[in-house]
């Protein structure tokens, strides 16, 4: 009887622990309603092969990471000739000659020998109906990114880190790639020391995406600006994309934070942009940006290229126009030792009608809240 009681108690503890494993909270903004793997029984990969298999199969899954999965040297290395468009100083990134990029785009750049890890160049495929979550602060993928592409939908990535993807090399790999996907929520993810983009949404439609509470850490030994500030931050380049960015910490970058173009509607709300040595926004043709309640601190140039349209709520009174389209007023942004961001185009705000819209808080509490809550381990 005693052993039976002990066993029953242990089983109850295990069952309670298993039941507690899952996604925390729910998506806000365009990806509202995403369920990922739903109530599927959690699986705990132990090897990189198991992780790849779980992420890429046809099953609805809740995949829990309890350690670092290091892909760095899992596919060997390639040695070849690249180029150095930004110089040959020790802090400068150099470029892999992917698809003859050096010859086609930087023909005057000096050639240079490159050696990079093959695993980083192409990320792990994530198929539909997946929740990928980290346990505490321990779930990480090193040396390889994630790809949500080719019609994948209903995916949640939460509370993990993606790091150390050929940081010296442009075209060495992206942390998280989306292209031709729908209903994707990426939340409390830390990305650091990446060769190319921390986030890239490709040229096909990426419908209903929410990027929330993420930490884009731009500190790196190598950068295209040769100053330790990573240039390739967030690139939103899809066709008919709907993207919510809320509560993210964009830190120590020098450009593309974000770059928005090609029929992308971005709601950028309550993010903290801090210590950006170059520029934050590029808004190319077809980029439509509503920016409200953000804080820009020590951002030299908030907006560099402006060929699309943006409404940045230049005054409290100006923000009243949003009530017609969002059902509430928009809130002003905050600035400290930063450039200006006072665009007042409202012609595209009607595109928000009928969609799931993230709430907005006053900018005054954003910096402290984002620093405390963004990234892995801060659920």
Curated annotation (Swiss-Prot):
The entry's keywords: Carbohydrate metabolism, Cell wall biogenesis/degradation, Disulfide bond, Glycoprotein, Lyase, Polysaccharide degradation, Secreted, Signal
Protein's cellular compartments: Secreted
PANTHER family reported for this sequence: PECTATE LYASE 18-RELATED, PECTIN LYASE A-RELATED
One Gene Ontology molecular-function label: pectate lyase activity
EC number(s) recorded for this UniProt protein: 4.2.2.10
Main location: secreted
Cysteines engaged in disulfide bonds, as pairs: 83-102, 92-226, 322-330
Positions glycosylated per UniProt: 129
Active site residues per record: 256
Function: Pectinolytic enzymes consist of four classes of enzymes: pectin lyase, polygalacturonase, pectin methylesterase and rhamnogalacturonase. Among pectinolytic enzymes, pectin lyase is the most important in depolymerization of pectin, since it cleaves internal glycosidic bonds of highly methylated pectins.
Enzyme class: lyase
Name of the protein in its database record: Probable pectin lyase A
Gene Ontology cellular-component annotations: extracellular region
Protein family membership: Belongs to the polysaccharide lyase 1 family.
The organism's place on the tree of life at top rank: Eukaryota
Taxonomic lineage: Eukaryota, Fungi, Dikarya, Ascomycota, Pezizomycotina
Signal peptide extent: 1-20
Gene3D superfamilies recorded: Single-stranded right-handed beta-helix, Pectin lyase-like
Naturally occurring in which organism (per UniProt): Aspergillus niger (strain ATCC MYA-4892 / CBS 513.88 / FGSC A1513)
GO biological process: cell wall organization; pectin catabolic process
Database matches in InterPro entries: Pec_lyase, Pectin_lyas_fold, Pectin_lyase_fold/virulence, PEL
Reactions performed catalytically: Eliminative cleavage of (1->4)-alpha-D-galacturonan methyl ester to give oligosaccharides with 4-deoxy-6-O-methyl-alpha-D-galact-4-enuronosyl groups at their non-reducing ends
């Amino acid at each position: 009887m005693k052993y039976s009681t002990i066993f029953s108690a242990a089983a109850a503890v295990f069952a309670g622990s298993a039941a507690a494993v899952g996604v925390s909270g729910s998506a806000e903004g365009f990806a509202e309603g995403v369920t990922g793997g739903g109530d599927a029984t959690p699986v705990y990969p132990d090897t990189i092969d198991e992780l790849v298999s779980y992420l890429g199969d046809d099953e609805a899954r809740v995949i829990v990471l309890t350690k670092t999965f290091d892909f760095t040297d899992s596919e060997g290395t390639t040695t070849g000739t690249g180029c150095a468009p930004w110089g040959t100083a020790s802090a400068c990134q150099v470029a892999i000659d992917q698809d003859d990029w050096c010859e086609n785009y930087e023909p005057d750049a000096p050639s240079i020998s490159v050696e990079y890890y093959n695993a980083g160049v192409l990320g792990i495929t994530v198929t539909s109906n997946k929740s990928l979550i980290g346990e505490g602060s321990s779930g990480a993928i090193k040396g390889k990114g994630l790809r949500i592409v080719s019609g994948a939908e209903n995916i949640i990535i939460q509370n993990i880190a993606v790091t150390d993807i050929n940081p010296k090399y442009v075209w060495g790999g992206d942390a998280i790639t989306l292209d031709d996907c729908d209903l994707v929520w990426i939340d409390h993810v830390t990305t650091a020391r990446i060769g190319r983009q921390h986030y890239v949404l490709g040229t096909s439609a990426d419908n209903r995406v929410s990027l929330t509470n993420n930490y884009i850490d731009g500190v790196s030994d190598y950068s295209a600006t040769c100053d330790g500030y990573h240039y390739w931050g967030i690139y939103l380049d899809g066709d008919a994309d709907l993207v919510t960015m809320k509560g993210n910490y964009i830190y120590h970058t020098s450009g593309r934070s974000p770059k928005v173009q090609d029929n992308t509607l971005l709601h950028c709300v309550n993010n903290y942009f801090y210590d950006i040595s170059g520029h934050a926004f590029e808004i190319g043709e077809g980029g439509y940006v509503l920016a409200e309640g953000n804080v820009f601190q020590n951002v030299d140039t908030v907006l560099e290229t402006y060929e699309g349209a943006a409404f940045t709520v230049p005054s409290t009174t100006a923000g009243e126009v949003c009530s017609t389209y969002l059902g509430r007023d928009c809130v002003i942004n905050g600035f400290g030792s930063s450039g200006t961001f006072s665009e007042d185009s409202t012609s595209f705000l009607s595109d928000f009608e009928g969609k799931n819209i993230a709430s907005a808080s006053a900018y005054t509490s954003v910096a402290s809240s984002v620093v405390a809550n963004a990234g892995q381990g801060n659920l």
